[in-house]
Amino acid sequence: MAVPARRTSKMRKRNRRGHIKLATPNLAPCPNCGELRVSHRVCPSCGYYNGKQVVKVNN
């Protein structure tokens, strides 16, 4: 079985892992209530999506 010839340095390892990260969620204000919500999802505070109430929310 093959063995690495040289030890991978901290810098090389960190440069390689620089692209492995979480993306920030795309938040947009809800046109119905104004709360921030994730784009293309039902608003968790009012239950509206695309101008229609989709989910009944208990306040």
Swiss-Prot record:
Q: According to its UniProt record, which protein family does this protein belong to?
A: Belongs to the bacterial ribosomal protein bL32 family.
Question: Any idea what this protein is called?
Answer: Large ribosomal subunit protein bL32
List the source organism.
Lactiplantibacillus plantarum (strain ATCC BAA-793 / NCIMB 8826 / WCFS1)
> Coding gene?
rpmF
Q: List, alphabetically, the NCBIfam families matched.
A: rpmF_bact
Judging by the UniProt lineage, the source's domain of life is: Bacteria
Q: Name one GO cellular component term.
A: large ribosomal subunit
* Keyword Ribonucleoprotein among UniProt keywords: yes
A molecular function (GO) held by this record is:
structural constituent of ribosome
- What lineage is this protein's organism placed in? Bacteria, Bacillati, Bacillota, Bacilli, Lactobacillales
In Gene Ontology terms, what is a biological process of this protein? translation
Keywords on this record?
Ribonucleoprotein, Ribosomal protein
In terms of SUPFAM superfamilies, this protein maps to: Zn-binding ribosomal proteins (SSF57829)
